[in-house]
Amino acid sequence: MKNKLTKLEFKWICYDMGNSAFILLVATILPIYFNYLSSSQGVAEHNYLSYWSYAASLSTLIVALAGPILGTLADYKDHKKKIFLTCAMLGALALACFWIPSSWFAFLVLFIAAKVAYSLSLIVYDSMLTDITTEERMDAVSSKGYAWGYIGSVVPFIISLVFVLMYDKMGMTLKTAMMIAFILNAVWWIAFTLPLVKSYKQKYYIEPEAHPALDTFARLKDTLMKAKEQKKVFLFLFAFFFYIDGVYTIIDMATAYGTSLGLNTTGLLLALLLTQIVAFPASLTFAVLSKTKDTASLIKVAIIAYFLIALFAVQLDKQWEFWILAVAVGCFQGGIQALSRSYFAKIIPENASGEYF
């Protein structure tokens, strides 16, 4: 198996670099800005954390309901690119507008919209893996996607960090600094979306029906009825639902949790920057291991590691402990996400990848 990426594989990986800027912002700067907005309007510290977690949970629920429908619709011929581009652009547009709301509630509504659009774009994006590479290359390409996503997102993040941490020395308000950060990351997201949109062609698809929207529900029902015939797929989905929720909870809530404990803001942001840097070689290591080790076994190792990380996080109340958490998460975050994506892509029907993802 050749190691060099094809042009299409590289352009697919570019989207990981683009959208990762948004999710890094969500995990770092965004909770701090929401804390600033809510506290300035009299929201108690413990309520700030609750509202933030409610918003994250609600966005997850919306995606859980809309994702299967949108993914199934994307499997029809020439639908995948259109749906992907729409979701990505809506997410980037919402991100660019984050600085506008002065109300913490309006900000949360916009955040939910952006998070939902981002997550729906990922469903379609992940399903493209079957179109852009071969089965034997899926583990390596998926892992490299996450690896370059982590390191690529560091560029707009560092620039944003300079403005957010030094806005007063630059003679600007925090809101102006945030505006620059949000727009910069939105432009970055769009810029790394366009190469894939330009070159991607849907290789596996289902021929359009007379009423694709209505037939989407019929296909979903038919797939669920065949669950017993696809035990491997649905057993993995059942396990994935639980373990990936734990992974994303740690990613999404780390900064908000640290802020609520009163840990130093600059230290939190730099620690999470370290997570991205550590995740780059760690994800590439998983790509190398996947060539000689069973993918399912590597996923199990990462799950056990995350379980231990979560146990450590329960008692976390010191700055240095947060740094240990950041490094530990970086070691396994990319591996568990990348290999889960590629493993699932291998065991599902190629022409129904959107529906299954």
Where are the language model's segments positioned?
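Intracellular juxtamembrane helix-capping segments at the cytosolic ends
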Residues: 120-134, 335-349
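Helix-to-loop junctions at the C-terminal end of transmembrane segments
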Residues: 65-79, 281-295
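Helix-loop junctions at membrane interfaces in 12-TM secondary transporters
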Residues: 98-111, 314-326
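Structural signature of the two symmetry-related core transmembrane helices
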Residues: 82-97, 297-312
